[in-house]
Amino acid sequence: MIETSILTQISREDLEAKLGRFVAEEIVVRNGSSWKCPTYVQRIPPCRDACPSSEDIRGYLTTIAQAGMFKKSHEQALDEAWELLTDKNPLPSTHGRICPHPCESGCNRQFLTDGSVAINNMERFIGDHGLNRKLKYKKLTDKMSGKKVAVIGSGPAGLSCAYQLARKGHKVTIFEAFAKTGGMLRYGIPSYRLPEDILDAEVQNILDLGVELKCNTRIGRDISFEDLKKQFDAVFLGLGAHKGSIMNIDGEDSANVFTAASFLNRVNSGAKVEIGSQVVVIGGGDSAMDAARVSLRLQAELDAAEASGNADAYDQAREEVDRKAQHDEETVSIEKTALDSARSALRVSKYSKVTVLYRRTKDEMPAIAKDVVEAEHEGIHFELLTAPVGIVTDGGRATGVQCVRMELGAPDSSGRRRPIPVAGSEFVVACDTIIMGIGQVPELEQGMETLADKWGWLSVDKAFATATPGVFAGGDVIGLGISTRSVGHGRLAARTIHAYLNGENLNAAHKARPVKHSEMRMSFYPPMKRNEEKQIPVEEATRTFKETTHTIEFEQALAESKRCMSCGLCFACDQCRIYCPREAIERSFKRPQGKVMHTDYTRCNGCHVCHLACPCGYIQMGMGL
């Protein structure tokens, strides 16, 4: 066979001129650009395109699925999958538990009957594998740059930025205002969703790269922002948005009215929070759902404490009844029945009323859909199309929420239908505690105000640079978003900072167009059952802050990895070789994964059969059919 293949990296401009259709991740051009020649095009899968942290999802799934094909042990394949995953996201176990997985909404498998690949479950499994194996993050260079970078905040954005910069040989110091790391991951997400030991282990892995950590250190109090800029070659601001928004209605300054951010912070910090028997949560976002479900668990703890005290009284009464039994069995039988009924009643919590008020319908709720469903299953009551207009107070404490019914009108700027008050529909919801989960804003430290916009968010350009040279920012401090978005911001900001420290011009990263399901042969893929994580029973979940779900088992993970359709990259299905009428295609596993197929162009007649047979959209004809 005459080898005429070359591997080229093609610029966006050249590629658009030649293809006129899509931007590829990488093209393997074989035998020139004739329209008759099969061209192997490694394209961006839609899952990665939808992932805010740009994880190589296809890469780590197919590494596991094809382990046997490349004669790797399962352990070796999982180790490699972990390395691929953590190249972009150093907190896989964490995000495998909390991420709303937009990647799954992008997955092309959703267009089949068996649904999207359970990417989030796989991320959690791979992350846990890394922790169980005590795998360590590796530096990209052993040479230190001599440059120092200050990272303000140890939330997902700050941790991600510190991780990437440390791998590149820079000396990184994290300044954290709280007593522990994690930002909203620790102080805003309940432990039943994210256990503290999981977060601690992944943060420690980042620190083990040589990152210095200074907790209980607030910029503006312990060190000025100006001094910080002088002492470090670059500064990344990842402060997050820890201040809960308020509604500006009468009575919200009452002692028993909290924002969701402050409420969750207190609970997660271990502070005792008394909420009483009737809790009202205002809002339909993630913080509101977390606050509602945490309230239910706090009430269960109070109920358990009371039940324990009453159980002691029950035991004493039962002993007295047993003594009576020696003389009057009939009377004692009645007393026993009454006592047992009373004890059963104690098991039903009277501290179980948590009500969520939301001004639109459930379909418009911005919270993670899964969390809304779980909240309903746990017994949380939803008052939809309901807006608070005031707070009823008595002696400086809130006793109720004044509400009005709403109806939906025309869509607003967000695309959701605008809620309109219904005249004469006012009513009051009684409460012992009110929690407002309507949003959060940053608390900028002294000296940072000049970097903010008129709404109080830090302003950055597309490379995450502020108007001040050497100062960069990302994560919730520039606008609220999900945690993986903050991880992506931290990584991209680190890329900018690295170029800045080296005096390099940063080339703009161009977004590739993902392969669509309509460009694939979907009929090739047989139905395969999706592998779901197991949940603990609701009655147990609502009485504990222990994790409510279990990581999938190895057999499930292996099966789930094989559900990946490897969109845009060869997975050695052999269809092209089987159907080639000229027997011009051969396969060799000595080549890298994804590039095992090879065309002998001395035999190829350009019939397009390989292109039509390829299920994953990898084979194009020439420079675009």
Protein language model annotation of sequence segments:
Residues 170-186, 307-321, 325, 355-362:
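Glycine-rich FAD pyrophosphate-binding loop
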